[in-house]
């Protein structure tokens, strides 16, 4: 009989196991290709946490070290393990016919949220989350209907309207499309079948709160400053890096695609086939700051040799 994931991951919150039925998912075979190599996780910078003063105590089990005025380091081995479980959860839900809503309104998440949601025919919110998207469905559906009517009129070049009226309608349509394009499919999806995938539960706290009220399961990235109980299942990782978010969300999208017989882009692929985006300059500055803290931490604890510090192909030992 196959071992269960609950035997493999002893640190999973019992609440997560109960809500998401982790015990039903077979454990990985240690001889198989990892979902993402530790080297690739390092390259993506998933291990960068926040300053120790900003941490959330419930994330302690996923951190290598706590030191005041320094940066927390997330254990990449646990990130890898939890990402594997999250992949299997999403794949299992997709096989059972669940629909997904990708949520990431911070700039580092926008592109990957849109791309992977479109790729998997999922709903997404990458701009401002409109209050009541899930809890005041009638209002949202009314706006969607208005947008559809305007799109039909636009297809006919707003025939019968004056130039001034056309400009007003075009402006109204553009605004509606900006806010609602990603949730067009919401009108055809019963909320009980939705699973939310969120890049930052703190940034998108309203979305998380609404999902909670409607009983929608939530899988999300939990950085060192995030209360993991905000989501039903958390993946400990850096939520401020384009590379980190792209890596994790592409893997989750791979699970949906795999369940439908589609191609996997990152999950269980070789490192050379996983191309990550370049981080913007502002992120690079933040990364350099975190690198300095990590290098100091590594040398103090002799976790890595000086010649190994911060090289992408270096493994961090817990």
From Swiss-Prot:
One of its GO terms (biological process) is translation. Disulfide bonds: none annotated. One of its GO terms (molecular function) is structural constituent of ribosome. It comes from the Bacteria. One of its GO terms (cellular component) is cytosolic small ribosomal subunit. CDD domains: RPS2. Keywords: Ribonucleoprotein, Ribosomal protein. PANTHER family: 30S RIBOSOMAL PROTEIN S2 PROKARYOTIC AND ORGANELLAR, SMALL RIBOSOMAL SUBUNIT PROTEIN US2M. Belongs to the universal ribosomal protein uS2 family. This is Small ribosomal subunit protein uS2. It comes from Mesomycoplasma hyopneumoniae (strain 7448).
């Amino acid at each position: 009989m196959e071992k269960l994931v609950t035997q493999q991951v002893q640190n999973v919150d019992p609440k997560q196991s109960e809500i998401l039925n982790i015990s039903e998912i077979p454990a990985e075979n240690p001889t198989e290709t990892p979902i993402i190599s530790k080297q690739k996780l390092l390259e993506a910078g998933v291990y960068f946490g926040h300053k120790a003063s900003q941490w959330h105590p419930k994330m302690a089990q996923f951190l290598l070290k706590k030191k005041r005025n320094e940066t927390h380091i997330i254990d990449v081995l646990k990130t890898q393990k939890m990402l594997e479980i999250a992949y299997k959860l999403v794949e299992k839900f997709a096989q059972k016919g669940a629909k997904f809503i990708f949520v990431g309104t911070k700039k580092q998440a926008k592109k990957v949220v849109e791309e992977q949601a479109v790729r998997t025919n999922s709903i997404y919110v990458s701009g401002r989350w409109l209050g009541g998207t899930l809890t005041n469905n009638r209002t949202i559906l009314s706006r969607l209907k208005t947008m559809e009517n305007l799109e039909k009129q636009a297809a006919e070049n707003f025939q019968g309207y004056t130039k001034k009226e056309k400009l007003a309608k075009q402006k109204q349509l553009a605004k509606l499309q900006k806010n609602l394009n990603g949730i067009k499919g919401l009108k055809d999806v019963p909320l009980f079948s939705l699973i939310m995938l969120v890049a930052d539960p703190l940034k998108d706290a309203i979305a998380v709160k609404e999902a909670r009220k409607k009983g929608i399961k939530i899988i999300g990235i939990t950085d060192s400053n995030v209360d993991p109980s905000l989501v039903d299942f958390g993946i400990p990782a850096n939520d401020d890096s384009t590379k980190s978010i792209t890596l994790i969300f592409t893997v989750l999208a791979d699970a949906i695609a795999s369940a439908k017989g589609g191609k996997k882009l990152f999950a269980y692929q070789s490192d050379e086939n996983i191309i990550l985006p370049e981080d913007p300059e502002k992120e690079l500055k933040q990364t350099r700051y975190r690198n300095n803290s990590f290098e100091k931490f590594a040398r103090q604890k002799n976790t890595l040799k000086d010649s190994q510090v911060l090289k992408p192909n270096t493994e961090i030992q817990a």
